[in-house]
């Protein structure tokens, strides 16, 4: 299942593991995906003496990640191949403190302050490019707050459950049986929804931080931050995520000097470039209020942080457009969707409408025409 090149990479990734991890597998003897799951996990485990598998007959199919024999709270009801293979690897590495994309101190405090217990379930597709971000963000929260558990569920091998829960888009997140999120997201956005649902322990006030320039935004904001830092200014960039909506672009072929890249890779490259300068990168934040006080622009961020500077550069990027018509919010994930690649298969052999005649709209219509019985562009 894994070729020798991938195994060599995994051996390098797992070389620094300190704790021992077990893939605790529970699967029915006749489950159609049993062999695929067991083979995958055994091959991954063969890449380090710090990894092992334990197989038990049970109903359904799942495995739990154990650290030194203790349940981490991370559960996969899936064969984590495709885009979710990275989620499997990051679960192990992050549990050992060797991963990446750990939240900063303030976001970590907010996660730890969530009131539990919290039981989360994410329904996903292995072909979905947005699902890993959600799965990995929630798994990170599990590792930081022992009151949280998270199951990542592949809808294709849990079809009856998907129909019962009326899931029509991925990723869809449920919190103790209540749907709280559908579609792409960031750690900051998911954290806000959990805070609203469960509440938090009150945190101590955080001292206001002062800069020369504050930048709020996406790719243009990253450019502004770099130019400002090159002039010797003290700069912070505040955003929900670096790159903004460019993260959703599958292929980019019109960035001069770069023949081909992806949106996610470009966002990673932006972040890497920002890291070359003395720029504070404050991700997973939503700006709630901007005030001008004694010539200073004061930004209040969700969670209680405040920042101030004499100069504020606003470059907010783009988001999925909504119609703002009655019923739209109610039916997101239940008939209203934004991603033809991730959610299109849920509408196979059905009549669909695509709203928008621009480039993205026509591309979506063409993609959907291959699986839907009828596509109408408005």
Residue ranges and their predicted role:
Residues 178-189, 199-216, 243, 247, ...:
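FAD-binding core/adjacent interface of flavoenzyme oxidoreductases
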Residues 206-242, 324, 332, 338-378:
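Rossmann-like dinucleotide/flavin-binding elements
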Residues 49-59, 146-160:
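Thiol-based oxidoreductase modules, predominantly thioredoxin-like and allied folds used
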Residues 98-113, 201-207, 212-213:
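Long, charged amphipathic helices and adjacent flexible linkers at domain junctions
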Residues 57-74, 159-176:
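Structural micro-motif
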Residues 32-41, 247-306:
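N-terminal Rossmann-like dinucleotide/flavin-binding domain of flavoprotein oxidoreductases
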Residues 3-42, 111-146, 152:
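Local sequence-structure signature of Cys/Sec-based thiol-disulfide redox active-site neighborhoods
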Residues 67-99, 174-201:
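Non-catalytic, surface beta->alpha helical segment in thiol-disulfide oxidoreductase systems
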